[in-house]
Amino acid sequence: MVGMEWDTGARGLTGRPLPWSMVEGILSGREVGTPRPVLHEAEPECLSTPRPGPGSTEVPGERRGSRQGERSGEIPFVELHATSSYNFLAGASDPGEMVDRAHELGLSALALVDRDGLYGAVRFAEAAAEVGLATVFGAELSLREGVLTVLCRGVEGYRRLSHLITGAAMSAGEKGSVDYPLLPQVAEQGAGHWVVLAGVEWQKKIDHLIECFGRDNVVLEFPARMLPEDTDHHDILRSIQTRTGLRGILSTMPTAATRDHVRLAGAKCALALRANLAEAESSLHPMGGTWLRSGGALARAYPQCGDLLATTVEIASGCAFTFDLVAPELPRWDTPDGHTEMTWLTHLVESRFDRRYRSRPAEVRERARAQIRHELGVIEQLGFPGYFLIVDDLVQFCHNATILCQGRGSAANSAVCFVLGITNAEPITAGLLFERFLSRDRDGPPDIDIDIESGRREEVIQYVYTRYGRDNAAQVANVITYRTKGALRDAARALGYPQGTVDAWSRGASEPPADVVELAGQLKGQPRHLGIHSGGMVICDRPIADVVPTEWARMEGRSVVQWDKDDCAAAGLVKFDLLGLGMLEALHHMMDLVAHHRGITVNLWELDLADAGVYDMLCRADAVGVFQVESRAQMSTLPRLKPRTFFDLVVEVALIRPGPIQGGSVHPYLRRRSGEEAVTYDHPVLEKSLGKTLGIPLFQEQIMQIAVDAAGFTGGEADALRRAMGSKRSPTRMAALRSRFYQGLADTHGIIGDTADKLWNKMVAFAAYGFPESHSQSFATLVYFSAWFKHHYPAEFCAGLLRAQPMGFYSPQSLIADARRHGVEILPISINESGVQADAPDGHLRLGLDLVKGLGEEAARRIAEHAPYTSIPDLSRRADLGVAHIEALARAGALDCLGVGRREALWQAGIAATERPGMLPGISAIEAPALPGMSAFELMATSIAATGVTHDAQPMALLRAHLDALGVVPADRLLTDVADGTRVRIAGVVTHRQRPQTASGVTFLGLEDETGLMNVMVSPGLWDRQRVLARTAKTLIIRGIVQNATGAVNVVADKLEPLPVGEWLSRGSRDFR
């Protein structure tokens, strides 16, 4: 009805309801009506002479006539209780969006608070610095007495809050929990450096708050959430204010930057409550949440709240500070008497030089010594000797503990790292540029990644905690964000759809409805929870909590900072990357197996890198299980590249990467390699830098070398050019470097005009996709080592890979099938012969008990320890196994060695499991009935279900007669017996489904039969037509065109068919007789 007033509860402090038209405008975000004057009994001091707190900066716009105030004409206001998406499963907008919106609204400052953390602090600070918005930092603390919002007064307040949160998280003993002390102890830690916001929920404890924190540090928080209960809360808080004299502020407590995001905020809150939106309705805001409002909007909605608005600015002026914390330094190294860190590092390098270079030519040794002198000078000038000593200590710990490790990445460009034993790529003969790793012109510490065998990485991590202390060392976080499937699942869950339907959508069996798609799109990319970085650790000379809180990680014994690697770098925390690498673990197992069974000691770093047999094998794309070159794309490239030297492997590692593929380097290089295209250079000066890659740029270091050779750049200048050309290009820096490059070309070689333009444009284009040669060098060593074992010791190679699972591109079933194709006899799982893991006795492959699903490591260990066994009751009693254990072993065929069939073994399991230690043996025996044996297919199906593998045959072997009748061609004939361009039918077990971003929508299917692997290309159109079959089938018959002219085989599919396994293997059914 026209003119009717609707009691929204938005009556401010007058008790008079606002008209619905104004409420509608406020809720929609429209500015309605003329701003009403804000009445003050006296001019608030904060609007004229702000009083900065410790470490604070003046709040922009807090004075009358400031630029922001003039621009917007708004009432000065600061939102002091905002929540971003880094308050996991609560806020809907990221810190940057919150900052941008606050700036647009004319707010003079903003406070972002996370629950029991400072997760978004760095991103908040960086976003605010870009727009000149003052920042207030704080957190919501889950105290025993209730949730309390704390704002920091300057840097010291921040440091104290970080320590409080750290103590609460670490004392709780597990991830996701906090255990704060009682309120008086909390206040004691703040020591007057915090402002606490008390809402109506603190009304009965307000005197206790004042007693603990002091009257000047307690502020009443009046809600402005446009809820009916707001008015009642205002009345209560005004009464408390009258009695106590406390200051008050107004806050919308926003969980989103704008109204557009509040539905997402509501959905996330429902998920946090483990409910859907309907179930959580009583706990959620009717709109889903609240959003940032301007001072003017709040003044219109709450016309007599002027004192509350003014107080927000006053408090911000005493709390805001710029986030330029002084980060802790690295621990000082305990050097022997008479040594500094630098002299001790020099001593270590000199003492280990001969070990690394004794066998090198004299000319290389002299160049290496000169390079090392240069590198040590740079390290000393930049003040990083302690960094290298810490890394060296970690590597020496690994060596002493016989843990395989090696440094990789840009550290491989350093001769110092090579001599110390940190890296294994020799940079002098490889021509690697040290400045790619470290230079006088670069800010920040070097970055050394250490790959450690994955099964023993935890030992190294715990060594760091022990050596440097839990307070001074922690892992770097990884913010886990929603990806497509996770977003779809949680969106559907929030909207109340049943789990079975959600599972079908996730599998792609059907399309989700529009509301799910829309909400999932909003969730995608949003932070969900805090995880652990793959290997980053920060190590400091004082508590990390001075800068960022730490908390327990999910994994036992791990603690983690609340920031990711980028946040840590921005705050000046030095990160060390300790990365787990499955291939190093597999190689260690291979070495141990060869030593144990053959009595041969293999020293990886002494292997001959020119073994012709290894390269012959790789030229055939016989690379299943070989590090980095076993993927579909790599195996398709190997026959075209035809690697014959170690550097060819370096190229192979770098070639099949998204960058070179998108940059168009792959095919030109391969054509030049095969002689189909002449090797040319845009200018003769490029031959030095591009000669080893046939005139095609592949490596980042080549950009630097071109700048050095063609334009006379120093190494440091060349690295600055490389970084400037990276993903975050600065137009200003690019312009300056372009001018320097052109001048250098002219001065050094007289290159001008079109040739200069061509060189510059090629470098700019290449910079976006170049791969570090140092990285390729490090990985190429592991390519060779793993290929060497595959060629010389295939049984030990496969056993090592199985022991290191999960890792690599292929499943254990595919690895075992590949070993079988290489002549290795596969021995089944046996309680009397198998160990916990795979073994390689006498050149055979014995499968391990760890493959048995549902058995568990402890039970497997007991079985192996007490073997052999004479019967199932004997096994049950001595290995202390239950019914489920014996049933799992029976299905896996591990009891076949006792002379009982699998069905009989399953029958005996329940009875035998009553034989426990301390009981008389044999009294529980019951005769099993006569049970039929299993067919070959039933045995295979049972083995796959129980272990995921088959020891005696690949599944397609049982179907070969049927496949031959259909004209299906085996994998091993596609290269030798089928002409390029022939239409064929193939069939196999689906091993992979891939859709690389570089493939223009083409999906690649991996198929395997008993003779080998096949690569199938499915066009977007065919995929769409047969989507359900393509996505869900475990076996397929595929019709398509063979492509094998280059020596690598692909099949371009034009039809997918289900493989009728059940029909072919059925014994017939008895229907309705």
From Swiss-Prot:
GO MF terms listed in the record are: 3'-5' exonuclease activity; DNA-directed DNA polymerase activity; nucleic acid binding
Tell me one GO biological process term: DNA repair
Q: What is its EC number?
A: 2.7.7.7
Sorted alphabetically, the keyword list is:
Cytoplasm, DNA damage, DNA repair, DNA replication, DNA-directed DNA polymerase, Nucleotidyltransferase, Transferase
Which stretches are tagged as biased composition: Basic and acidic residues? 60-73
Report the domain of life of the source organism: Bacteria
Report the GO terms under cellular component.
cytoplasm
Coiled-coil blocks: none
What the entry lists under InterPro entries is as follows:
DNA_pol3_alpha_NTPase_dom (IPR011708), DNA_pol3_finger (IPR040982), DnaE2 (IPR023073), DnaE2/DnaE/PolC (IPR004805), DNAPol_HHH (IPR029460), NA-bd_OB_tRNA (IPR004365), PHP_dom (IPR004013), Pol/His_phosphatase_N (IPR003141)
The reactions it catalyses are: DNA(n) + a 2'-deoxyribonucleoside 5'-triphosphate = DNA(n+1) + diphosphate
| Region of interest (Disordered), residue spans | 41-73
Its subcellular locations are: Cytoplasm
- Give the family from UniProt: Belongs to the DNA polymerase type-C family. DnaE2 subfamily.
What the entry lists under PANTHER family is as follows: DNA POLYMERASE III SUBUNIT ALPHA, ERROR-PRONE DNA POLYMERASE
Q: What NCBIfam families does the record tag this protein with?
A: PRK05672.1 (NF004225)
What is the documented function of this protein? DNA polymerase involved in damage-induced mutagenesis and translesion synthesis (TLS). It is not the major replicative DNA polymerase.
Instruction: Quote the protein name from its UniProt record.
Output: Error-prone DNA polymerase
